[in-house]
Amino acid sequence: MAKGKRTFQPNNRRRARVHGFRLRMRTRAGRAIVAARRRKGRAKLTA
């Protein structure tokens, strides 16, 4: 069976821009995500 192409092509700049802290702080929903992760005690808040 033929498998599909590798879909994960790591790129640190894109990772930060799409999931990073500054992007999260931009929107109300993003700030809520960071707050929830702080409440839960996550070591990593964002990418």
From Swiss-Prot:
The keyword DNA damage appears for this protein: no
Question: In the UniProt record, does the keyword Glycoprotein occur?
Answer: no
Query: Could you cite one Gene Ontology molecular function of this protein?
Result: structural constituent of ribosome
Listed A to Z, the keywords are: Ribonucleoprotein, Ribosomal protein
Domain of life, per UniProt, equals Bacteria
Task: State one Pfam family annotation.
Answer: Ribosomal_L34
A single GO BP: translation
Q: Which Gene Ontology cellular component annotation is one that this UniProt entry carries?
A: ribosome
Residues folding into a coiled coil are none
Q: Where are the transmembrane segments?
A: none
Q: Where is the signal peptide?
A: none
Supply the PANTHER family for this chain. Answer: LARGE RIBOSOMAL SUBUNIT PROTEIN BL34M, MITOCHONDRIAL RIBOSOMAL PROTEIN 34 FAMILY MEMBER
Which named protein is this?
A: Large ribosomal subunit protein bL34
Organism, scientific name? Corynebacterium glutamicum (strain ATCC 13032 / DSM 20300 / JCM 1318 / BCRC 11384 / CCUG 27702 / LMG 3730 / NBRC 12168 / NCIMB 10025 / NRRL B-2784 / 534)
- In the UniProt record, the gene name given for this protein reads rpmH
